[in-house]
A protein has these predicted regions:
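Glycine-rich phosphate-binding loop used to anchor ATP phosphates in small-molecule kinases
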Residues: 109-135
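Conserved phosphate-donor/acceptor-positioning beta-strand/loop module used by diverse small-molecule
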Residues: 125, 136-162
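Short beta-strand segments
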Residues: 50, 122-125, 147-149, 234-236
């Protein structure tokens, strides 16, 4: 509630300035990594992954109510983005593989995490990590993953809301224009930069969002079966919102975390209080009200991955 109030009262220019400061704090570890003793990988980190607008922020906020967990006060991509910004790789995409981990990068990331989590388990939520699971496994060999899935129509509609909420959620200023977005046309890209984005430069918004949903979820499904089931935890957005207390308690048990009073209180509040990133109150068939005709056009495109996800 307090965070939502601050968001309403504080001008976005001020919030963005504060965000830039917070974004750069973990980078203090970069020069220190050259002189500090070598840090070991954090033990059993937890990565919350899922397509943008699938509810990953809600899940992260719930996990951070645990006294056993700590994040770096921002999405984890700020740790490795200096090493792997898309502009340094021909603006290809946000995808990274195991071979992309560098020696100096490894020492810097380990030190930065150790500085900020201070003995607790590291937890992170970064939607781009849907495209980076092999990279994360190379950096953090004993990591666990919490994969949040959401029904295709609802998720794509929420992505469309996010794209329209400029300047929020803009991730990159591309070297080439997007020309099929009407008033949103231009070089700005929101959320995950997916492989093959250049083929979408003339595509309408609903197709870009559908392709983001497909790319994020298909990448996860391709690698999921190769990970020890004890380190992989599926959560459905629909279950999280319909029965948050039971869903979060079950997840905490699977992750070996204590389900304390603060966690329980937060879980109970989710039925009435959406996340601070929620753009409009949740309700049944909201996607039909907001973006029905557009989303219906891409439902055939979404159907195969939706079936693989159990929808």
């Amino acid at each position: 509630m307090l965070r939502a109030l601050v968001r309403r009262l504080v001008p976005i220019v001020v919030r963005r300035a504060v965000w830039r400061v917070r974004r750069n704090v973990p980078r203090i570890a970069q020069p220190l990594s050259f002189v500090a003793p070598r840090a070991s990988p954090p033990e059993r980190p937890i990565f919350v992954i899922g397509c943008p607008r699938s509810g990953t922020t809600v899940l992260l906020e719930s996990l951070l109510r645990s006294t056993q967990l700590r994040s770096i006060h921002n999405e984890g991509h700020i740790l490795w983005q200096p090493h792997h910004h898309p502009r340094d790789r021909g603006w290809d995409s946000d995808r990274l593989g195991a071979g992309d981990v560098g020696k100096r990068e490894r020492e810097y990331v380990y030190l930065a995490v150790r500085m900020f989590v201070r003995g607790r388990r590291f937890v992170d939520k970064t939607p781009e990590n849907c495209l980076r699971i092999p990279y994360l496994l190379e950096l953090f060999p004993d990591s666990s993953f919490v994969f949040l899935r959401r029904r295709p129509a609802e998720n794509v509609s929420s992505l469309m809301e996010g794209w329209r909420a400029r300047p929020r959620f803009v991730t990159y200023r591309l070297p080439e224009r997007l020309d099929g977005l009407g008033p949103l046309s231009g070089p700005n890209w929101s959320f995950v930069l997916i492989p093959g984005w250049r083929q979408l430069r003339s595509a309408p918004l609903e197709e870009i969002c559908a392709r983001q949903y497909i790319a994020c979820n298909e990448e996860v499904l391709e690698v999921r079966d190769g990970i020890d089931p004890s380190r992989w935890h599926d959560v459905a957005y629909e279950e999280l919102t319909a029965a948050p207390l039971e869903t979060i308690r079950s997840l905490f048990e699977r992750l070996g975390l204590a389900f304390g009073p603060a966690v329980e209180e937060h879980a109970r509040s989710l039925t009435s209080r959406p996340s601070f990133t929620t753009l409009s109150p949740p309700r049944a068939d909201k996607w039909r009200e907001l973006n029905g005709p557009e989303v219906e056009k891409v439902l055939p495109l979404l159907a195969p991955v939706g079936r693989r996800l159990g929808y």
